[in-house]
């Protein structure tokens, strides 16, 4: 769960901000972020029905009215969002291709609208291939657990 909350150490979401969690799996990072930012609106998207069923149950059990789980491939979405969050779904160039057109320009939080992505390892080459300017935040700056040693939040504005 701390891994998911590292995003909140980088960016706080404003009231009414629309956040898309791509490949949400069991609800990370969208569930912890929806708890932390009750005035923001989260869409948790995954193409696997079983995973979305879990997120639906968790959201209902926690009373998260600001979280909407959707069983969908993100490439087919037509809605636009202020921020896109995700956790190691695919290579960054492919990910950016999927979601860039879904991002609204503007600023609905402490950073301009954009992508906040959780990923580990050496990302320099992968990020360069996107053609975007990225800001890399090492998670050990926020949390001292050994698990986070190579983990990062990477951000690029729309």
Predicted regions mapped to residue ranges:
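A generic alpha-to-beta junction signature in SAM-dependent methyltransferases
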Residues: 11, 103, 107-109
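Active-site capping/gating segments
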Residues: 120-158
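A short, conserved alpha-helix within the catalytic core of class I
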Residues: 92-101
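Short glycine-rich anion-binding loops that position phosphate/pyrophosphate groups of nucleotides
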Residues: 25, 88-91, 123
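Conserved beta-strand segments of alpha/beta enzyme cores
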Residues: 41, 66-68, 114, 133-136
């Amino acid at each position: 769960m701390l891994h998911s909350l590292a995003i909140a150490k980088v960016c706080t979401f404003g009231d009414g901000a629309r956040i898309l969690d791509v490949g949400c799996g069991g609800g990370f990072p969208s569930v912890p972020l929806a708890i932390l930012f009750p005035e923001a609106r989260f869409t948790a998207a995954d193409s696997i029905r079983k995973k979305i069923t879990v997120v639906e149950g968790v959201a209902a059990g926690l009373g998260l009215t600001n979280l909407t789980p959707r069983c969908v491939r993100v490439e087919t979405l037509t809605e636009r969002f202020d921020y896109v969050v995700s956790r190691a779904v695919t290579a960054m160039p492919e990910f950016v291709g999927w979601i860039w057109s879904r991002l609204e320009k503007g600023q609905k939080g402490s950073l301009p609208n954009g992508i906040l992505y959780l990923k580990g390892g050496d990302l320099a080459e992968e990020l360069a291939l996107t053609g975007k300017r990225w800001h890399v935040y090492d998670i050990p700056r926020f949390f001292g657990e050994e698990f986070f040693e190579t983990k990062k939040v990477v951000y690029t504005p729309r």
